[in-house]
């Protein structure tokens, strides 16, 4: 499962979500963290919404990948709750 976490330096909610993702043992997660301050497009799109978690989907034999934005969970969610949500995908 390939995930993208849109974040920025000093974002404690982002850091908390990243730590929880790293604690998940039952799913193989390839996590890419993108700093929104390095891209004007990302910054404009996500500046008020981070942390944003997206699933990268590839279509069959095609090399093209698309991002599917995942539902935002409460910062108080547990690792188990996050894991349960991700298992749906």
Q: Can you name each region flagged by the protein language model?
A:
Residues 28-40:
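Thiol-based oxidoreductase modules, predominantly thioredoxin-like and allied folds used
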Residues 40-47:
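N-terminal beta-loop-helix "entrance" segment that forms/cooperates
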Residues 1-23:
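Local sequence-structure signature of Cys/Sec-based thiol-disulfide redox active-site neighborhoods
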């Amino acid at each position: 499962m390939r995930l993208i976490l849109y974040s920025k330096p000093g974002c404690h909610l982002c850091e908390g979500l990243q730590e929880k993702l790293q604690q998940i043992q039952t799913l193989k997660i390839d996590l890419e963290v993108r700093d929104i301050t390095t891209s004007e497009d990302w910054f404009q799109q996500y500046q008020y919404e981070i942390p944003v978690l997206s699933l990268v989907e590839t279509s069959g034999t095609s090399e093209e990948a698309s991002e599917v934005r995942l539902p935002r969970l409460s910062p108080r969610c547990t690792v188990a709750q996050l894991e349960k949500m991700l298992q749906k995908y």
